[in-house]
Amino acid sequence: MSYLPSSFDSDADDLDEMPFLDKMIYHCKQQPLVPLGTLATTGAVLLAVLNVKNGNKRKAQIWFRWRVALQGFTLIALVAGSYIYGTNKNERESHEEQLRKKAKMREQLWIQELERRDEETKLRRQKAELARQKAKEMEQETSKLQQELKDLEERLKK
């Protein structure tokens, strides 16, 4: 039986082997709002620091408030993304289970097809062997008849 490639391996095995940058990109694709919230929070902190440095306390306070709101948004995005990703993972696992069953069914059908073809080949070989035997018998019978014909011709000559 040939090796069937596994198309339903989990990503967890591959995730451990990924380099850091690839892991980061993978997770950012899984939960795109979290990096956006983090960048927005960082921007708010930077603007608040710049306003503090310039002496504009009122704008600095506004940007610090934005920082808190954006951190809250990031946290909510993180929790919501984890929940959504968890439900999608369960759906994917059930889908993967269906794919496994389908692959197993295809494998069984392929095995049955191979067995059917093997039986057909055996039947053809048996028929060919019978035909060879029959041809051999016919050849022997033909040689006997030719011998009888020669004998009869010799008798007629005498």
Curated annotation (Swiss-Prot):
<protein>
    <recommendedName>
        <fullName>Respiratory supercomplex factor 1, mitochondrial</fullName>
    </recommendedName>
</protein>
<feature type="coiled-coil region">
    <location>
        <begin position="88"/>
        <end position="158"/>
    </location>
</feature>
<keyword id="KW-0472">Membrane</keyword>
<keyword id="KW-0175">Coiled coil</keyword>
<feature type="region of interest" description="Disordered">
    <location>
        <begin position="128"/>
        <end position="158"/>
    </location>
</feature>
<feature type="domain" description="HIG1">
    <location>
        <begin position="5"/>
        <end position="96"/>
    </location>
</feature>
<comment type="subunit">
    <text>Associates with the respiratory chain complex III/complex IV supercomplex.</text>
</comment>
<feature type="transmembrane region" description="Helical">
    <location>
        <begin position="68"/>
        <end position="88"/>
    </location>
</feature>
<dbReference type="InterPro" id="IPR050355">
    <property type="entry name" value="RCF1"/>
</dbReference>
<dbReference type="InterPro" id="IPR007667">
    <property type="entry name" value="Hypoxia_induced_domain"/>
</dbReference>
<comment type="similarity">
    <text>Belongs to the RCF1 family.</text>
</comment>
<keyword id="KW-1133">Transmembrane helix</keyword>
<dbReference type="GO" id="GO:0031966">
    <property type="term" value="C:mitochondrial membrane"/>
</dbReference>
<keyword id="KW-0812">Transmembrane</keyword>
<keyword id="KW-0496">Mitochondrion</keyword>
<dbReference type="Pfam" id="PF04588">
    <property type="entry name" value="HIG_1_N"/>
</dbReference>
<feature type="transmembrane region" description="Helical">
    <location>
        <begin position="32"/>
        <end position="52"/>
    </location>
</feature>
<dbReference type="GO" id="GO:0097250">
    <property type="term" value="P:mitochondrial respirasome assembly"/>
</dbReference>
<comment type="function">
    <text>Cytochrome c oxidase subunit which plays a role in assembly of respiratory supercomplexes.</text>
</comment>
